[in-house]
Amino acid sequence: MRPLLERLARSTLVCLVVVLSASSIAEEDEQKSTRLYVLDCGYMDMAGWQGFQTFYGFPESAVAIPAQANPCFLVVNQGQSLLWDAGLSDATPSTPVMTEYGVRFSLKSKLAKQLQDLNYPPEKIDYLALSHLHFDHIGNLPYFVNVKTLIQRDEWNAAKDAGPNDIGYNRRSYSPLEDFTKLILLDGDLDVFGDGKVTVFRTPGHTPGHQSLIVHLDQHGPIVISGDVIHFTEELGALNEASDDAAPGEPASALAKLFSRVEEIGGELWVQHDPVQDKARKYAPEYYE
């Protein structure tokens, strides 16, 4: 009986070693794979809002989009992580509420909870990259006070110099950055992890220091995330009409730079706020790789 028990014990130990080895290999493979998660960071009901005509000079014929998605994105690469934008505040109610901007905001899922569920809680994020400092992209800044945070220097200066009537810049939203311990001000493009997988690149126009994101995925291929260079695909005609004589750094040239990068890398353009594209995206815990 004892030899049988010893053989069973040895067999169990071998199986356990095999399982643990397979688990280690799986974890190693997961770390080597670049993954992109889409996170729910709010929704904006913009029915009747004339902000694109009032603030950006679009013609009255500009198409009216009744709603915009407001996703954030988590990139995991070689065991490191980058969060793109911080969305509406987790304090935003789930029922749409009218704000002083004339837009109804709502939030179904809190960003902190989504990150926690993916085992990347806010305090463990390696990088936070912000497309720009308008309030709908930075609502959860207080979670990331000790995270390396990437913004363009021009954007930081524009926010600090903004007057009370400047659309989008809200001191209550961006002031937490003043307490950040690892704020990194960029003066151009950055290969974030040094391996060409994730790049932030300047696209000034919507704001003076706006930036967009490129993520190279092995299976899906390259994805270019627009930020607010463009809000929805139907905007293209109106944007071109409004910006025929735009100077460098204004919307038309930013859009041209965005399209140039998409074409250069053979990428797929994700219009961040576009509600139609958003419905086709798979959200976390599913991912792209």
Describe each region flagged by the PLM.
Residues 1-12:
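Bacterial N-terminal signal peptides that target proteins for export
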Residues 11-20:
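Bacterial N-terminal signal peptides
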Residues 20-124, 152-202, 220-227, 250-266, ...:
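Metallo-beta-lactamase
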Residues 41-42, 86-88, 133, 154, ...:
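Active-site metal-binding loops of divalent metal-dependent hydrolases
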Residues 90, 101-113, 214, 219-289:
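Cap/insert and terminal regions of metallo-dependent hydrolase folds
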Residues 96-151:
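Active-site metal-binding motif and surrounding structural segment of the metallo-beta-lactamase
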Residues 135-141, 205, 209, 279-289:
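Short, electropositive alpha-helical surface patch
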